[in-house]
Amino acid sequence: MLGQSIRRFTTSVVRRSHYEEGPGKNLPFSVENKWSLLAKMCLYFGSAFATPFLIVRHQLLKT
């Protein structure tokens, strides 16, 4: 009896918590505008690529 009520409760919770599905719907940013996505990706990957060079430049200018 208790097992059936627990099973009924968990399946109803899963059924009520429905999210949008499809490509790009599970990402924390919008992929609708390709130019905005391009700018965000360039900023993200560009900063990761440039950081070691900026650190080396800072260290060389320090001495």
Curated annotation (Swiss-Prot):
Gene3D superfamilies: Cytochrome c oxidase subunit VIIc. Keywords: Acetylation, Membrane, Mitochondrion, Mitochondrion inner membrane, Transit peptide, Transmembrane, Transmembrane helix. Residues 17-33 are mitochondrial matrix. It comes from the Eukaryota. The keyword Hydrolase does not apply. It is a single-pass membrane protein. It holds the Pfam family COX7C. Residues 61-63 are mitochondrial intermembrane. This is Cytochrome c oxidase subunit 7C, mitochondrial.
